[in-house]
Amino acid sequence: YTDREDNIKVEDGFLNITAKREDFSGKLYTSARIHTQDKYEFKYGRIEMRAKLPNWEGMWPAFWMMGANYDTLGWPFCGELDILEHGDYVKSSTIDDPGLISSAVHYGPSDHKSQYATIPNTIYFDTGQENFVRAETTIENPFEDFHTYSLQWAPDKLEFYVDEELYFEFPLASQSSPFDKPFFMLINLAVGGHWTDGFVASGFTEATYKIDYVRVYQ
């Protein structure tokens, strides 16, 4: 990631994060990440982004949140909320659809495995180091059209929306920690990585993740 205007800039009212194939500091690709850590951290509310996704296989755009106590507790104990991730359709064995997007809730090892393993329409993971629950849905025209990706964060539950439609609800009654502490926001565009099993389209030169706005309502 760099802070160069080649990779991140505001233009015509949009935040553009651009990934490029180029030789830079010994790396094959460049891109950017922006965050609000130590600048804007908050607890509860509605968090929303309107964006258009980059149109290249191998891109991994994300809009997510991390616990503000990350530096002291570390991950995954600080908690992570993935409001949007896109790109793993290139490795999906069940849904080969460029419109596939997902949201997830990550937290430390939990005693409430049976509760979260049975949330409808979700995928539950227990890696030993962390637990997380992920939900998937599909959208139309992810590269041509803007869509809104939202999280409604309350003391008792997390609700994830795409274009105002609820598709993932995570109860917090038994697992409020670490989601009862302030979090900060991040937006980034990765290239390859485990999300795509390292795959990047051979003809890739550059792609842009275009963000119209990010809003927090409290």
Per-region residue spans from a language model:
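GH16 jelly-roll
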Residues: 1-218
